[in-house]
């Protein structure tokens, strides 16, 4: 992130809260800035969404009675911008003392505002309390690599793609780890995630993959940028025929962000994990 971009970001700063609906809180961050460092242009080698879950969504009905809901917001990775997370929190909080005629109206306003700022069509789903039972805790289906013994001591925590390698045998498998930690590029605060990697191709060395994910522990980057870096490093180093990288980050400020990147047709599930 360049300094001039960080200058306008509300994250880590004292920012006033609006008592009523205020879309001016929304702050865009251009995707192209981080993608330049990965050598990515407009012709992306992946597709997929960023799935945001909003757990603190509330507004007033036409008589002033509070309503609560869960929100699911899906941004395409082809959007011009991501939305800075604190700005989205402030935006959603501005609904708290604003009256709306219906849940459908709230959904439409959020969809219109986020689509405008992101620069692409955004999907919004709102779950009312009667639908909360639809949200259940799940787990990845693949093999967890967290208990593998690493042969060498870890002394540095910076992304190192050279840890990634493959063997001669072909396989199709899903691997996951709960050990990803990255850091906010603005505040330096840690972000935690489970990373699910599904691929077909030459078998990825699992110890090397685990060491690679651990190497992000002091890396600074937004969630979306970190996942795209992981995706591109695996794609470039291991050359799978098919690859999907899906990260489920823990929530902050009532929001969690879950980037999904794939080389093939999108078929994703909003897979809520225990730490979320």
From Swiss-Prot:
Major subcellular location class: cytoplasm
TM spans (from-to): none
A Gene Ontology molecular function term of the record: preQ1 synthase activity
HAMAP family with a match to the protein in the record: QueF_type2
InterPro entries for this protein: GTP-CH-I_C/QueF, NADPH_dep_7-cyano-7-deazaG_red, QueF, QueF_N, QueF_type2
Gene3D superfamilies, alphabetized: 3.30.1130.10
Binding site for substrate: 83-85, 223-224
Pathway annotation: tRNA modification; tRNA-queuosine biosynthesis
Keywords: Cytoplasm, NADP, Oxidoreductase, Queuosine biosynthesis
EC nos: 1.7.1.13
Binding site for NADPH: 85-86, 252-253
Protein family membership: Belongs to the GTP cyclohydrolase I family. QueF type 2 subfamily.
Protein name per its UniProtKB record: NADPH-dependent 7-cyano-7-deazaguanine reductase
Keyword Oxidoreductase attached: yes
Subunit structure: Homodimer.
Catalytic activity: 7-aminomethyl-7-carbaguanine + 2 NADP(+) = 7-cyano-7-deazaguanine + 2 NADPH + 3 H(+)
Any Pfam family: QueF
EC class: oxidoreductase
PANTHER family in the cross-refs: NADPH-DEPENDENT 7-CYANO-7-DEAZAGUANINE REDUCTASE (PTHR34354:SF1)
Organism in which the protein naturally occurs: Desulfotalea psychrophila (strain LSv54 / DSM 12343)
GO annotation terms (biological process): queuosine biosynthetic process
Catalytic residues identified in the record: 184, 191
